[in-house]
Amino acid sequence: HLPQVSSSLHSRAATSVVDLNGNEIQLHDMLSGHYLTTANAPVLESTALFNNNNNFNHDVVNGLNRDPSPTFPTKQAVKKDRHSKIYTSQGPRDRRVRLSIGIARKFFDLQEMLGFDKPSKTLDWLLTKSKTAIKELVQSKSTKSNSSSPCDDCEEVVSVDSENVTDHSKGKSLKANNKCKEAMDSHQAAAKESRAKARARARERTKEKMCIKQLNEAIVLRNHQFEVSGTREAFVHPVFGFHQQNYGNTSHENWDQSNFASQSNQLCAIL
């Protein structure tokens, strides 16, 4: 038989546990505290609410209308997007654009080279430099849309418009060609007139030169004849004296007159 344990030990064992080190843990105290909190929880909540209501009423009576929002926490307001949207044909678009790493590096390198402080200025510069490419793209898009239209009537209208445009362009080109031809003809006519006048002036100059040359030759020939006649008179014997000399002088004078008459006739024929 086991030895009987005293009642004091039994009651003690019911309310305590002995651990390995000999210390006693009071289970009754732990459980009693738990039961107290659970049993008195509704009472505590009601008293807390009553106290809050009393404080609120007291503040209203005293003239302090405080906001009871601290007692009831509210949700924080969601931050609105301060960037406005842009409405396009594809719908609203955000003004902010996300770039890849490589494109972002190139973009900011270009911005540093240009010396701009805002990315929008860099984009504006790029758009202005690519105006011709944008125009070509718009024209290609418009031609594609016109060519891909399913309506036959629309195609006929487009073809008629293109024919009218081609005819109009041909008419303009013909007018321009006619104007160019008229200008060329007038220029050529003026050039022909100037050349004809130049040739006439050249002929006149040559005639004058020929006349002067012939006169000079005639003068030289006459001087030579005078010299020859003077030497002949020195060798002639004065057989008849004065009559012979007068005959020689009259003969020379008659020859010179006939020579000058012939030369004048030639000059008149040339002129």
From Swiss-Prot:
Region (Disordered) residue spans: 64-85
Entry keyword annotation includes RNA-binding: no
Residues annotated as domain R: 192-209
Pfam families, alphabetized: TCP
All copies of domain TCP, residue ranges: 79-137
Domain of life of the source: Eukaryota
InterPro entries: CYC/TB1_R_domain, TF_TCP_subgr, Transcription_factor_TCP
Protein name (Swiss-Prot/TrEMBL): Transcription factor CYCLOIDEA
Lineage, top ranks: Eukaryota, Viridiplantae, Streptophyta, Embryophyta, Tracheophyta
